[in-house]
């Protein structure tokens, strides 16, 4: 993952309260997301998961959408986006998302009991978003075949004590305003 690794090493760091936050095209849409970086990420995801056993890809809005769309296009697996807007459609399930810097209500539609899903997201940091998504999918009765976050920010997160294993492409930590690569192969 040379391009992903290099782009993370070059990522600017900002502070949101006590939280050191790296600004990256995968997680923030800035700086510009180069097609070769997106292609590298998508190929790595497809190699890391068993897409043959997946009925739908599920991703939370907003920054997982571009990655999940590209994976959907390459695999012909339909995509479900978990949104921050409620529509009140039949079967809509609400979930509360809490991250290191925000709290939101989100909504999922079009996932049914027994469907096999691949959950994709951009970053696993506190685990708040992923935990809420996985809990909602459990509530629906979906079978989570695999869960992937492109980047994992090393440290404790809400999924450490859960039954869900999250595969990642690269693991980093932010130390003194700099991104440090902890594991260039990620988890799983």
Curated annotation (Swiss-Prot):
Pfam families xref list: Pribosyltran (PF00156)
Gene Ontology BP annotations: purine ribonucleoside salvage
Alphabetical list of PROSITE patterns matching this protein: PUR_PYR_PR_TRANSFER
InterPro entries, alphabetized: HGPRTase-like (IPR026597), PRibTrfase_dom (IPR000836), PRTase-like (IPR029057), Pur/Pyrimidine_PRTase (IPR050118)
Signal peptide coordinates: none
Keywords linked to the UniProt accession: Purine salvage, Transferase
Keyword Transferase among record annotations: yes
Entry's EC annotation: 2.4.2.-
GO molecular function: transferase activity
Cited function: May catalyze a purine salvage reaction, the substrate is unknown.
Protein family according to the UniProt entry: Belongs to the purine/pyrimidine phosphoribosyltransferase family. Archaeal HPRT subfamily.
HAMAP family given in the database record: Hypx_phosphoribosyltr
Protein known as: HGPRTase-like protein 1
Organism of this sequence: Haloquadratum walsbyi (strain DSM 16790 / HBSQ001)
């Amino acid at each position: 993952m040379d391009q992903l690794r290099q782009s993370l090493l070059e990522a600017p760091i900002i502070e949101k309260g006590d939280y050191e936050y790296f600004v990256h095209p995968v997680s923030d849409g800035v700086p510009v997301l180069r097609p070769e970086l997106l292609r590298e990420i998508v190929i790595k995801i497809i190699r890391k998961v068993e897409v043959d056993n997946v009925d739908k890809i599920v991703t939370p809005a907003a920054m997982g959408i571009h990655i999940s769309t590209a994976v959907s296009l390459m695999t012909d697996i339909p995509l479900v986006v978990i949104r921050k807007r409620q529509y009140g459609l039949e079967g809509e399930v609400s979930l509360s998302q809490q991250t290191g810097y925000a709290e939101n209500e989100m909504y999922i539609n079009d996932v049914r009991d027994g469907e096999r899903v691949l959950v994709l997201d951009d970053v696993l940091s506190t685990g708040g978003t992923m935990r809420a998504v996985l809990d909602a999918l459990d509530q629906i009765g979906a079978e989570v075949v695999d869960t992937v976050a492109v980047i994992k920010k090393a440290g404790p997160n809400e999924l450490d004590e859960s039954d869900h294993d999250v595969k990642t492409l690269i693991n980093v930590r932010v130390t003194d305003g700099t991104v440090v690569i902890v594991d260039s192969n990620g988890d799983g």
